[in-house]
Amino acid sequence: MFRLSKVIFIILLIGGLIMLTSCREEKTVKKSAFEYNNLIGHGVNMGNALEAPVEGSWGVFIDDEYFKIIKQRGFNSVRIPIRWSAHISDDYTIDKNFMERVVHVVDKALENGLVTIINTHHFEELYQDPDKYGPVLVKIWEQIAEKFKNYPDTLFFEIYNEPAQQLTPDKWNKIYPEALKVIRKINPKRIVIIDVPNWAHYSAVKDLKLPDDENIIVSFHYYEPFNFTHQGAEWVTPQLPVGVKWEGKDWEVEQIKNHFKYVSDWAKKNNVPIFLGEFGAYSKADMDSRVKWTETVRKTAEEFGFSLAYWEFCAGFGIYDRTSGTWVEPLATAALGK
């Protein structure tokens, strides 16, 4: 009886070890880029803060509580634009205090259960002289990748926001793989987002040459029609007249669907997930038009299986009023869908 009990015990022990190993293997099953893209879901950009020359100089300082507010509202993710190039020394080392500020912001976003995307944003010199500053972008990413190498897989990297001007499609297709290469040396499996050229315009997806990398997501931005979304914007030259409406007419909706289908067809052909990294209409447009446009863009992105992030949280395009501590409705609902 003792010998039989011992045999049974050993069998149960082996069975338990097999089950434990199986559970561990299940926990470490690699998600596909499409599954990670689904985790982005519905997000919002923390715009006008860390991508300003100095945080706060454009009116927005990221408070820790913002991430709790965003999560409780139902958003899945945040995209954090960052102007690293304003905080580097002559040898391109990132300022320690600025790096720690970014770390703090990322930590707070992740602590609140938000998928977090960090990028390089407003690297103006790169736009004008990509041959000279492309290697600087690589150096910046080497430091970022090292700093965040042990972070969870819900932190994503986005190499650069809206390549354009002298950073032509041809130049971009040569520079971004070099940044990706240094990221992969330190973060071999982390999701990396790559913007399409020409200000991340939907029509430029065809100009992006994809790398042999299964852990990437491709991103485009959507501000069409531009004379509606950017009417009255002070930074646009010449300044666009105010008063342009978007009424949700059949032809207006169809235009958005056609643009998104163009992106979707390319994505299916190349088997890559799509992230609509920015979309929004400036506050100089009337609220009714903004709500209709935002809701239509969001719904169309959902129909095509794109993840998305509204531009932006609490500034000129914002869906949250910092002064009153309330959501701007019905615009926030239009951006999120609930």
Which stretches of residues belong to each language-model region?
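An active-site-proximal structural segment forming one wall of the substrate-binding cleft
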Residues: 67-76, 92-122, 127-156, 172-186, ...
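Active-site region of glycoside hydrolase catalytic domains
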Residues: 138-250, 257-281, 303-306
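Aromatic-rich peripheral "rim/lid" segments of glycoside hydrolase catalytic domains that contact
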Residues: 286-338
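C-terminal motif of bacterial Sec signal peptides marking the signal peptidase cleavage site
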Residues: 20-22
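N-terminal carbohydrate-binding accessory modules
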Residues: 24-79, 92-93, 266, 334
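Acidic/histidine-rich helix-loop elements
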Residues: 46-64, 84-95, 229-255
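Bacterial N-terminal signal peptides that target proteins for export
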Residues: 1-9
